[in-house]
Amino acid sequence: MKNSFYKLLLIPFFLLTSLGAIAEELNVSAQEIQLNKETKITYATGNVQISDNKKNIIFTDKAEYNKVNELVRSFGETDIITSQKFRIQGEDIFFDNKKQVIYSNTKSVITDINGNKIYTEMFNYLTEKNMFFSQGEVKVVDNRNNEYLFSEVYIDERKRKIVGSDVRSFFNDPSFKTNDKNEPRFFANSAYIDDEGVTFDKGVFTTCQYREGKKCPPWALQAKKIKHSKAKKTVYYEKALLKIYDFPIFYFPKFFHPGPTVKRRSGF
């Protein structure tokens, strides 16, 4: 039988793909590369490194490239550094070179340049827009160990912003707790996280202990918008309503209080 494979060892290899006049170049290096000229599939094994001209780099131990579909697939543990220096860790990740999207339907961890981690069940990464999307059970753990649970999120690498819906946020940072019994948390319709802090839309804040199955905490602050400013160390509320056992007590058009890291502040 005629051998349909070409084998290349320990050398970089360039894959040129194009639909029209413009070619997108992928740079592949591995300990061993095999080319199947009949199926037009390239197999790479051993210290595989694949990069595009946007400087997205895929690291894995085994991968294949289907020239017909312009699809790269990794097998097993995979590490990706995006052009904006975000890190993706997961398994069995795909790179659709035709659509310019990197995606996975298995659990992955995305780490941004500030050390915040996003745990996903699936993700799509648009390499042209530097934008992630994920849905399902999405957990964000920031660099202070605070947790945010979303049903879906968008991550904008360029603006360094995370936007998500159906958020439940648990602040585990010790500075947010006045005693061990406090469990500060924000529940909201949506939220976005950036370098300035966190903003919640149509949210509720309380520090009462979380009681699974209970309808309401002893007290809570409900507001149209809640913003925690890291720079000013202050929590701001718009159209806030103080509730005691879910019964409305006071309404404040605007309201703010010092953040938990502030011990004393004159005025209110």
Describe every region a protein language model picked out:
Residues 5, 19-22:
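Compositionally biased regions
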Residues 23-268:
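Structural signature for solvent-exposed beta-strand/loop edge elements and short helix-capping sites
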